[in-house]
From Swiss-Prot:
Span of the signal peptide: 1-24
Gene Ontology, cellular component aspect: extracellular region
Disulfide cross-links: C48-C70, C66-C109, C83-C114, C104-C123
Domain of life where this protein originates: Eukaryota
Protein's organism: Amblyomma parvum (South American tick)
Compartments (UniProt record): Secreted
One Gene Ontology molecular-function label: C-C chemokine binding
Function: Salivary chemokine-binding protein which binds to host chemokine CCL5.
Protein name, as recorded: Evasin P985
Record Gene3D superfamilies: 2.30.130.100
Length: 132
């Protein structure tokens, strides 16, 4: 009887852990990873790729902003990393209309903020952009 109670009590926990791990892996696979982020400099908990868009100018991936969520952790991209001054919400709005984002403001990460360098270019999503 006691083993049945233990099994029934632990089943929801096991299901939660299994589902939580699976969704994180699936979401991570959907992201376009930035090629310019030095992931070795990130916190050990920041193992997910940053949500990124691809430049039509040079076909490189740049992160959206300089802070992103990875498995409930806020991850800050290193200073000096090229980025786009865009939010995930803004990108999703544009991608509902077409396949590109016409006004991607370029910048560099500084203390967790993507600071504009005054350049604007067209960018696009290679894969579905989701937050992890």
């Amino acid at each position: 009887m006691h083993s049945t109670i233990a099994y029934v009590s632990l089943l929801p926990l096991a299901l939660f852990v299994a589902m939580h791990g699976a969704s994180t892996d699936e979401e991570s696979e959907e992201l376009g990873a930035s090629t310019d982020v030095d992931y070795e400099e990130l916190d050990a908990n920041c193992t997910c790729p940053a949500p990124a868009l691809t430049s039509t100018r040079n076909n490189k991936h740049y992160p959206l902003g300089c802070i992103y969520n990875c498995s409930s952790y806020n991850c800050t991209i290193p200073d000096g990393t090229p980025c786009y001054v865009l939010t995930l919400g803004e990108v999703k709005e544009h991608l509902q209309i077409g396949s590109t984002v016409p006004n991607c403001t370029c910048g560099l990460c500084r203390n967790g903020t993507c600071v504009s360098n005054g350049t604007v270019e067209e960018c696009f999503a290679v894969e579905e952009i989701e937050e992890t």
